[in-house]
């Protein structure tokens, strides 16, 4: 039986604005035998691992993999939630793979990573939302890479205190949870998420002393004033690091791009973010939550 239970979408690419030149990325490797992208892909395929890089059709895949960095995605490649902007499949997930944490650690060691980002699909079918699976993965990585920085990009876990405690006990170097969009757009963009719930997750983590991080995707119909209000909300709950990037419609069935935000606006928002207290604001059309994540931990222009 096919586990995917997709509802038909009605969006279209026909009325989407034309993609500007600043979003067109090319990356060439003169020596195919030493192509770093192929090296990372082969390692991931060998270990049968999922990455958000591929599952979410990230535009920076080639760039990040050429740096031999990747964001591992736990819990399979089927999400229990369905967001209109996201290219990850939704439906009924398979049971967790108990060997996945060990394989992720083996891949991280083989690639000699110095900054590992671990995220997951939403697993609302699990009592702890997959928190214990995160913990096992962190433990396995630290066995082989004790000096590696570990960033956890977690779902909201429905703000269950028991699940959050499991994450806190991992003691991640960065605690990341993406708000994604402004409050007004949540019902359309992420109907199974709650704006206040996401802020609560970040507030609790900040209060516990963790370096917290969040991200917004622009171009889905928000106004500049709404973005600034959202940034203020994130700063007020203690978020230190912020990423701002351009939304790109994955397929014709996903939410259409409403606007391609010009690079100058991203620059202005970076300045604004610094002015209201963020330690670092990584802002640009191609920026994603884990883009150059190893630099973001200390980035402070």
From Swiss-Prot:
- Location relative to the cell: Cytoplasm
Binding-site list for [4Fe-4S] cluster 2? 79, 83, 86
* Cofactor(s), by name: [4Fe-4S] cluster
Q: Which UniProt keywords apply?
A: 4Fe-4S, Cytoplasm, Iron, Iron-sulfur, Metal-binding, S-adenosyl-L-methionine, Transferase
The biological pathway it contributes to is: Protein modification; protein lipoylation via endogenous pathway; protein N(6)-(lipoyl)lysine from octanoyl-[acyl-carrier-protein]: step 2/2
Q: Where is the Radical SAM core domain?
A: 65-279
UniProt-listed Enzyme Commission number(s) = 2.8.1.8
Mind telling me what this protein is named? Answer: Lipoyl synthase
The species this protein was found in: Leptospira interrogans serogroup Icterohaemorrhagiae serovar Lai (strain 56601)
